[in-house]
Amino acid sequence: MKTMARQYARATTGRGQLYDSVVDTIGNTPCVKINNLAPDGVNLYVKAEFFNPAGSVKDRLAISIIEEAEKRGDLKPGQTVVEATSGNTGIGLAMVCAAKGYPLVITMADSFSIERRKLMRFLGAQVVLTPRAEKGFGMYNKAKELADKNGWFLASQFETSDNADIHERTTAREILSDFKSTQLDYFVTGYGTGGTVTGVARVLREKLPRLKIILSEPENAQIVGSSEQQGRTKNGSPAHSHPAWEPHLIQGWTPDFIPLVLQEAIDKKYYDQLAPVSGTDGIEWAKN
């Protein structure tokens, strides 16, 4: 029995390569089968974005914004980066900015978890809190104010094309590669900025025309499902909070406005169905 145990013991061999920087490990996250939640006859997989080095899909957005800004000359060596975030984008930016030597200032409503602030500060970011009564729109305006006042680089995750573009070039291609021998019938995603659904859908709509794309949002904050237009300024940024938004239980999921990045998915009908989910159900299924 001991011999059999050694024979079948799990082992690894390494990746066979060395990395020049932590940012080079972003992406190529695995699709993992979830064996205990799906109905009979259904194979359910998750794209495990927590395998990214700072723990979320926002690492992709962070490296894309910084590197594309460097290429364009919009971000100068040593220049301070500023962004409004509920957490994960700030954590991803803190990692990328630390690796590349940029100071980072994050604006965040004081309603978001203390753990997120601590992690961003641990990674070297300065965190500026805004009143929760001003919601996401308040921290968004504070970031713009600081950028204009100090000549800082505003990451603009809610408007920049660098957001959806990175998902078009990476996330979508990874999904196609992982499912090249397996039929994929549905792609289900929520939204924050809208970068994932917009970038992935650009590719999957073309390559997998029979695939159904399901967009999820909080049941009590159905800003897309309301069909009410988002007021915008001349540059596409939100002019105010969306009237259909209400506070919900999942932090970072669905801001109180429709980002310009998400607007592309709405205008081009990149999704086939909206799936509202209650906060309590979302938490319960995450635990399961």
Predicted regions and their residues:
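Active-site-proximal loop->helix
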Residues: 80, 89-146, 219, 223-238, ...
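Active-site/ligand-binding loops adjacent to catalytic centers
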Residues: 14, 26-28, 140, 206-288
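Short, small-residue-enriched loops and turns at beta-alpha junctions
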Residues: 52-54, 134-136, 161-165
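Active-site/ligand-binding-proximal alpha/beta "capping" segment
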Residues: 150-195, 199-203, 264-268, 272, ...
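Alpha-helix C-terminal capping segments
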Residues: 67-74, 91-103, 121-122, 201-208
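Positively charged, low-complexity intrinsically disordered leader regions
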Residues: 5-79
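Fold-independent oxyanion-binding glycine-rich loops
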Residues: 29, 47-49, 65, 85, ...
